[in-house]
């Protein structure tokens, strides 16, 4: 009798399990993307979709470095497949950005950036990379120059005395010299003025949000114009070895003193200097907002400009800023070039220079692209490691939208979204613009739970 009871119980349990399995089976869900219990549209791509979307390129650096079988499709390596003996890279050849998320030590550089850089070298793409340890520069600087024929520039903020130069006024000086040799070529003068304005805007807005200026907007705008005017004066009249940003600071500081002589009451020496220029000189026009104001306001404008230039007063930084740029924006866009930026973790006060260089190079690249019909002849990439630790980049979200159509790709690498929220964008809308303008989000984290959380955050809250 006991055995019969046990048998009945076991049959009942098995029957209940079978019934529950049938009721809650996934077979009852129709083959639809949404609308039958699913949330969101995210799903895994099929093999056919992967094959149709990406270029499949045999990844063979040994042959590439010998000049054999070089790939022709420029783009980002977003995946791979293959066996132990051969690897095929999956390359997106479109104008896309990629957001890399990974905690320290998970292999962001070794397992993803190195293949991307190797492929960029093989296809002739110019690139800029930021690095805290200097590994990228040490491992790929010589390879890029020796095997792929690249122009190399290393801006090493850890060892400035061993660094290449990066004169912010390089392009202004270049076109001012060309204009003085050919006074009839107004296009050279126009380019010098354009790059002077780019430098001034980059310096004034570096690490700041123009929307937060409020009632002080006049002083920042006028300081930008005054800075543009001074840069033009330095490029036009100073000796070649003195045409750099430190000279701009020294001139503004010295000309802040009151003017001497009769008829100069209430004026400073900057205003007196401007009176010596012809009326049609653009430097006089750029500084117009500051010149045509009260004495106290004029002093405030000049003090604002000086305060934005204070960061450049460093004996080590001057070893970089006071010498000619190895690779300017035009050479970067038109020739195979690689710029390695090394930022010291032990001295974060120098990080502003990285943000400044990125912003200036970006704005100058847009200018080069506009001169070539709106697109660069050769695709360029910014590999921005530790993007989240850099000082705030003004209108960072606009960089992602404006650069894409110009054939400039940006690859920001962060450790978490909290970094972007803290340093780059304070408004949720701007953060979403950066995420949504990054067509790829590469997640590489140590724990599966954390990785699932990030993937869920990127795809949708209910996917």
Task: Locate predicted features.
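Disordered, low-complexity tails and leader-like regions
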Residues: 6-7, 147, 440
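P-loop NTPase motor domains
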Residues: 77-85, 89-408, 423-424, 452
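Conserved ATP-driven motor cores of ASCE-family P-loop NTPases powering translocation/secretion/packaging/pilus
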Residues: 400-463
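Basic- and hydrophobic-enriched, low-structure N-terminal and domain-boundary segments
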Residues: 1-106, 110-118, 123, 161
